[in-house]
Amino acid sequence: LGTNMAGDPDAVASIAANLGVSPDDAAGMERVMTSAAHVGAWKWCFWIPSAIAFAGAIGLVVFLRDTPTSVGLPELEGTETRQVKTEKKGAEHKAFLMKYVFKNPLIWILGFANFFVYIVRFSVLDWGPSLLSQSKGVSMSHAGWLVAMFEIAGILGMLFAGWATDKWLKGRAHRTCVFCMAGAALFVFLFWQLPADAPIWLLFTTLCAAGFCIYGPQALIGIAAANQATKKAAATANGLTGLFGYASTLVSGVGLGFVAQHYGWNWAYVGILGMAVVGMLVFLLMWGAKADGYEPEAE
């Protein structure tokens, strides 16, 4: 979508055949060339995502509910916070937020970790096509597909990370994030070391493996923050950690571009790899933490 194919004889011939237009038909071939050029099609690259986002917003307004009790359901077992009644709009609620969010070192650790997770992720999303074409000799069309597959692999990584957290790590999402960041660092390193003439399938495999690993922490940080801050401060905790995530675009966007332009893509790879390693180390700071912050309140 949005790619000018008018210069590709095979594409033009295919469109003409599909439309039943003879090469001798000047008016018909003009329509074929217009179709091949995708005149104005680039606009749909904005309209389609916007329409999907708008439909999602309508769905949230219609179907999203506040709490289980608001629809007549019981509270989830183990999520009671009896000691601090946050329904009150006052000093008591502020004290709750200060204790469970702003003075909670685990929330700040998750925020700092999110900063590095987003750097690794957006380094590929923002610079992936340029990085692949200039450092690995991949055509821009193939580079676009590789970045798209990086995202798709990330979706699978999210699902696996969530399942593994519940299955093997007893809900300790921060521990899953340690393993995911280690995996992301490993596959970024392997991708970097591949020669420019490496088979496309090998580039595909290593890049997708990195995406599989890096999207796990991106999904789990919000869950971990909500669990540590408890349901009464989950939104505030997610807002704080999200602030760190989006602040990282200064590094992944401007910083990485500066490094690549002035020092080459090898140093850009070093930067991405370094961010993955630092992110892993930050997650390690809370390795011994419990899965959530509810237990002290369940007395």
Task: Give, region by region, the residue ranges found by the protein language model.
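Extracytoplasmic gate region of multi-pass secondary transporters
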Residues: 3, 99-159, 218, 252-253
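C-terminal ends and interior cores of transmembrane alpha-helices
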Residues: 182-196
